């Protein structure tokens, strides 16, 4: 990789991480009883008083400040592991929530009832952005056993390039490339639909 390209990629990743640290919260504010896996974490701020710009990520319940490359690197650098929180790390890698929302809105007539128990588009987009397992999705979206089976079959179909499970649920032919792409992305970026 050439040096300018490496710098561009590094800058892009740093910008995404800083945006996450500065402006986004993990959790479901505005909803009354989120499941334990989605309990809202305190908003992390860029360069809190006791952190400097070189180490802007403040660990929860600790005076420790981390460099951005230490966040979501597979090792607990914060005492309680807040730098490796599943929802934080999943959300950093996944497509933007607004992109998931736009996708869902375009497919809402067949995808929401068949895969997500007719849940609200905003809620489904947020859950897909942060969920780590099928258990997370099931508990927050109140999925039925049939929804879970449909999600698993649809994801399996997307992974192997077989649209038939989705077409059986009412997916229009023209939607296949977009549906396949998103389901594969979510799966490849950590949404384990086979884990409870």
Curated annotation (Swiss-Prot):
Segment forming the signal sequence: 1-25
Source organism superkingdom: Eukaryota
GO (cellular component) term, any one: extracellular region
Family matches, as SMART domains: LDLa (SM00192)
Transmembrane segments: none
Cellular localization per UniProt: Secreted
InterPro entries in the cross-refs: LDL_receptor-like_sf (IPR036055), LDLR_class-A_CS (IPR023415), LDrepeatLR_classA_rpt (IPR002172)
Name this polypeptide is given: Neuropeptide prohormone-4
């Amino acid at each position: 990789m050439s040096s300018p390209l490496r710098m561009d990629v590094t800058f892009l990743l740093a910008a995404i991480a800083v945006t996450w640290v500065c402006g986004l919260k993990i959790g479901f504010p505005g909803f009354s009883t989120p499941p334990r896996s989605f309990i809202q974490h305190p908003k992390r701020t860029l360069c809190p008083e006791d952190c400097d710009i070189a180490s802007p990520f403040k660990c929860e319940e600790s005076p420790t400040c981390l460099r951005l490359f230490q966040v979501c690197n597979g090792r607990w650098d914060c005492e309680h592991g807040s730098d490796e929180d599943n929802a934080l790390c999943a959300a950093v890698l996944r497509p933007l929530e607004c992109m998931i929302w736009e996708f869902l809105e375009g497919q809402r007539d067949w995808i929401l009832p068949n895969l997500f128990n007719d849940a609200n588009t905003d809620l489904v987009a947020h859950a897909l952005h942060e969920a780590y397992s099928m258990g997370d999705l099931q508990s927050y979206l109140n999925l039925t056993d049939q929804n879970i089976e449909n999600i698993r079959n649809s994801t399996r179909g997307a992974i192997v390039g077989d649209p038939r499970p989705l077409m059986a649920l009412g997916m229009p032919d023209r939607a296949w490339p977009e549906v396949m792409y998103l389901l594969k992305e979510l799966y490849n970026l950590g949404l384990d639909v086979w884990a409870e």
